[in-house]
């Protein structure tokens, strides 16, 4: 058997060129078969009273990669993730599962191609359990929310409470923006742990933490966005401040210096900020 268009993105574009694809496909096991899962988006640059992404301050630093830049350059001011594309890793069978039936853009495509898409109810439960909220969409939403969390007109006009993404030191003392990351944790007042995507915020020009945002990935809560703000009366350490405290610890500093000798180099992993009850746990691999 010969397979044409074996690359995942290429295979999907042959059938649905009107969908924009995520740059991060991931593989899962469902019913004993390997399945590639990739998020598909509908875009528009004509949504009324909506700001184009390219106008958001610092967008080029946050949204990197070809797929991200294509969205920004296209003047996009509307994006939804209504489809999960699933490709069988062995025989190439492709399914486009609709996870958001309220998207009007996808609704028009479904009218034109009624047999191309499959309802989510027809997806095996084992496969549905692997669907996760996409990092790319979450980056865009959290980037926009940095400014649009301000709901007072005068505060928004003067940009008095603009947030930013924290930075971290990973290699050669160069600061890098902290990327959103997946964790399994229990939210305040929740009954059980959930799989979710989170990112912290700091005030612009400062290093203390002011809030964190999460996108839920499990079951009926899938796609729900929550923001937890900290009291302005108490300053909480942000990732850069935690990096500094780690470097100032005598025992840790001596060990890092030792490891960095004789041609060896220490690479710092992404710093994780994990909310636990009424406190924060920092994990620095």
Task: Identify what each model region corresponds to.
Residues 1-285:
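Soluble extracytoplasmic regions of secretory-pathway and membrane proteins
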């Amino acid at each position: 058997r010969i397979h044409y268009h074996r690359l995942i993105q290429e295979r999907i574009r042959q059938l649905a060129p009107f969908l924009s694809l995520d740059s991060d496909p991931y593989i899962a096991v469902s019913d004993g078969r390997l399945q590639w899962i990739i998020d598909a988006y509908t875009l528009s640059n004509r949504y009324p009273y909506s700001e184009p992404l390219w106008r958001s301050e610092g967008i080029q630093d946050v949204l990197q990669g070809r797929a991200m830049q294509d969205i920004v350059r296209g003047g996009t001011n509307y994006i939804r993730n209504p489809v999960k594309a699933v490709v069988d890793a062995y025989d190439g069978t492709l399914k486009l599962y609709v996870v958001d039936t309220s998207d009007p853009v996808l609704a028009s495509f479904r009218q034109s191609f009624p047999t191309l898409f499959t309802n989510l109810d027809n997806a095996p439960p084992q496969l549905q359990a692997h669907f996760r909220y996409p990092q790319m969409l979450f980056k865009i939403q959290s980037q926009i929310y940095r400014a649009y969390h301000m709901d007072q007109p005068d505060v928004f006009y003067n940009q008095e409470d603009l947030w930013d993404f924290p930075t971290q030191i990973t290699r050669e003392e160069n600061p890098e923006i902290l990327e959103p990351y997946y964790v399994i944790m229990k939210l305040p007042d929740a009954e059980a742990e959930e799989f979710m995507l989170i990112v912290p915020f700091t005030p612009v020009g400062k290093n203390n933490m002011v809030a964190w945002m999460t996108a839920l990935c499990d079951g009926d809560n899938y796609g729900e966005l929550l923001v937890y703000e900290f009291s302005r009366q108490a300053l909480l350490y942000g990732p850069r401040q935690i990096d500094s405290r780690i470097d100032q610890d005598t025992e840790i500093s001596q060990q890092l210096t030792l490891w960095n000798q004789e041609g060896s180099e220490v690479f710092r992993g992404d710093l994780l900020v994990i909310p636990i009850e009424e406190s924060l746990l920092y994990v620095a691999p």
